[in-house]
């Protein structure tokens, strides 16, 4: 489950509070900024604030057609650091023309941030129990990549 209480680290190193909410178990759509699951996309038009979509490994942009022009952000969930599909999803969404915020969630920590940033991510929700300040300090550990990026 997405933890909306955690702070958000931007690729420029700034830290901010998360403004997005999820639909609760009661099914009531909250006011303000909302992140929807793929199954909840039918409620997109009713969101009063910013609109975000949570993409898991089961909802590939290759096999699903998302309303990219109606979304302010897409959250890509990393179930485990050794699962590279989230990187591919980010690059694919950028190639498909998504201009909004790409946010990495789930198993996100300092050692993977540069790879995520190079794949097109703008913001990161650092895994609970990991130090967000340490992660921010490591954002520029690698300044000269040897491979092309997105």
State what each model feature region is.
Residues 1-41:
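N-terminal, charge-rich interaction modules
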Residues 33-35, 50-54, 73-75, 101-103, ...:
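Structural preference for beta-strand elements that scaffold enzyme active sites
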Residues 52-92:
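Glycine/Thr-rich beta-alpha phosphate-binding loop at enzyme active sites
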Residues 55, 62-66, 110-123:
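Catalytic cores of alpha/beta
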Residues 57-58, 103-109:
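Glycine-rich beta-to-alpha transition loops that act as phosphate-gripper elements at the mouths
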Residues 121-139:
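Glycine-rich phosphate-binding active-site loops on the catalytic face of alpha/beta enzymes
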